[in-house]
Amino acid sequence: MNETLYCSFCKKPESRDPKKRRIIFASNLNKDVCVCEYCIDVMHGELHKYDSKYDRMDSLLALKRDRLRRMESSAYEEEFLLSRIPAPKELKAVLDNYVIGQEQAKKVFSVAVYNHYKRLSFKEKLKKQDNQDSDLELEHLEEVELSKSNILLIGPTGSGKTLMAQTLAKHLDIPIAISDATSLTEAGYVGEDVENILTRLLQASDWNVQKAQKGIVFIDEIDKISRLSEHRSITRDVSGEGVQQALLKIVEGSLVNIPPKGGRKHPEGNFIQIDTSDILFICAGAFDGLAEIIKKRTTQNVLGFTQEKMSKKEQEAILHLVQTHDLVTYGLIPELIGRLPVLSTLDSISLEAMVDILQKPKNALIKQYQQLFKMDEVDLIFEEEAIKEIAKLALERKTGARGLRAIIEDFCLDIMFDLPKLKGSEVRITKDCVLKQAEPLIIAKTHSKILP
């Protein structure tokens, strides 16, 4: 028999090296069974551990349950291995459907995600080739250790940082956990432990450890845990440098013990162990004041330099010149910055982009509200001037695209309250509805007149 044999229990292949894994093949009642020597040793030990046949039966059932768990785990790995990883252009095209503008950031993000999961796919191929003779090319590739491409996103609130991560995670069918760094504290203090981030990822993975270990962790407001100076603090900093040190452990890749089902840690309790080596970490923040640090560095040798307030365009342009030392000066520890090698900046949203965000993406807010009204057989129309005023209001509030829903909810609340009564009508949102809280125009289609 020339084909490679696989153990029917642990699913491991037979080694061509006689000193390694050997497999016994048996055919009985038209059913082929293969058992490796390691599984035979395990079963032999379990069967002789008990005296009664009932204890032996319980032991065999336990072995079967353990085998099913391992099969489920390996099935996910196999599924991930065989699934085609979309090219960066395909990933960017997906982002284009939901994120307006930010072209450079979307390119950087797509390439980083592609390289990360290509790395995981390669690692799984190496596992599958374990105990088998590989070709010269594979042996050459084994000598190269591929590092993780964790990402640091710098951009104002509502510019699309979180949305990009959520969009690709959904497209790739990968679990994602989103956390706010401002709520994190060092272990032992009031607040949220860093390990709770991984608990959220496990919950998003339906407590499937293998699936969680290939997921995405998004940590927002990372700039809010910066230390106050470049020099190491001699006092206890439970929500700044201390949290950065705790994050460093899980971001760089380590085995972390998580309480089962999100419970609290107990010295004698059981733990779920997660390897963070293959989890993609994305950290993001607005980094207010970083532009001034970069400007000071880039203009320090210019005679007659005076501190002048920069315009928005100048701030966006200078942020693209950010270097590691600027982030250290801002308050991030060098070790953490080193674990976030992919850096991208996002621009603030312009008025034109905000108008497009309201209308063009697949999940555009205007499309969502029109669909909600259509469920009650009511047509919702937004006039162009009204859309512009909504965009202007969001820019004035400095909430980015995130604040658009609150603005629309404000003037649509009363009309949605009476929506079931307006079946067969048309509701028109005008400029005055946004600026002066005027009532929307309600037009009865059948009578073609404005209702009081």
From Swiss-Prot:
The gene is clpX. Keywords: ATP-binding, Chaperone, Metal-binding, Nucleotide-binding, Zinc. Zn(2+) binds at residues 7, 10, 36, 39. Pfam families: AAA_2, ClpB_D2-small. Residues 1-55 form the ClpX-type ZB domain. The keyword Metal-binding applies. InterPro entries: AAA+_ATPase, ATP-dep_Clp_protease_ClpX, ATPase_AAA_core, Clp_ATPase_C, Clp_protease_ATP-bd_su_ClpX, ClpX_bact, P-loop_NTPase, Znf_CppX_C4. Component of the ClpX-ClpP complex. Forms a hexameric ring that, in the presence of ATP, binds to fourteen ClpP subunits assembled into a disk-like structure with a central cavity, resembling the structure of eukaryotic proteasomes. GO terms for cellular component: HslUV protease complex. PANTHER family: ATP-DEPENDENT CLP PROTEASE ATP-BINDING SUBUNIT CLPX-LIKE, MITOCHONDRIAL, ATP-DEPENDENT CLP PROTEASE ATP-BINDING SUBUNIT CLPX-LIKE, MITOCHONDRIAL-RELATED. CDD domains: RecA-like_ClpX. Belongs to the ClpX chaperone family. The lineage of its organism: Bacteria, Pseudomonadati, Campylobacterota, Epsilonproteobacteria, Campylobacterales. ATP-dependent specificity component of the Clp protease. It directs the protease to specific substrates. Can perform chaperone functions in the absence of ClpP. PROSITE patterns: CLPX_ZB (PS51902). One of its GO terms (molecular function) is ATP-dependent protein folding chaperone. ATP binds at residues 156-163. Gene3D superfamilies: 1.10.8.60, P-loop containing nucleotide triphosphate hydrolases. This is ATP-dependent Clp protease ATP-binding subunit ClpX. GO terms for biological process: cell division; proteolysis involved in protein catabolic process.
